[in-house]
């Protein structure tokens, strides 16, 4: 993989959020979608992390943090606080030529 051909952090967040919005209707409870839409402006967010270790239970490849990122999308108790009501965890490959995405949805 090419370190010079990676999505920036902002591009990674934007791509994960776009995928979340596109697929949320098929994967989240309607009440959760309504809550997210009503509360996102005040206390919603998307946070970028290195992939958590538990992804190894869901995917069968090396999650090198140089090329993979986890984006947590959800709601916090208040603006500026960490997300504690997680609606989706999105695993993305950051290499621009390698489109790969896995999502763990709120149950």
Curated annotation (Swiss-Prot):
One Pfam family in the UniProt entry: DUF440
Gene3D superfamilies with a match to the protein in the record: dsDNA mimic, putative (3.10.450.140)
Stored HAMAP family: Put_dsDNA_mimic
Family indicated by similarity: Belongs to the putative dsDNA mimic protein family.
Role noted for this protein: May act as a double-stranded DNA (dsDNA) mimic. Probably regulates the activity of a dsDNA-binding protein.
Name of protein: Putative double-stranded DNA mimic protein Spro_2690
UniProt source species: Serratia proteamaculans (strain 568)
């Amino acid at each position: 993989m090419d370190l010079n051909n990676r999505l920036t952090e902002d591009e990674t967040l934007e791509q994960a959020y776009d995928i979340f919005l596109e697929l949320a209707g098929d994967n989240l409870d309607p009440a959760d979608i309504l809550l997210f839409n009503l509360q996102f402006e005040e206390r919603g967010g998307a946070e970028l992390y290195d992939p958590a270790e538990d992804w190894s239970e869901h995917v069968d490849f090396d999650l090198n943090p140089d090329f993979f990122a986890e984006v947590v999308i959800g709601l916090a108790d208040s603006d500026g606080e960490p997300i504690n009501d997680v609606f989706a965890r999105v695993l993305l490959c950051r290499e621009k030529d390698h489109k790969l995405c896995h999502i763990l949805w709120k149950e």
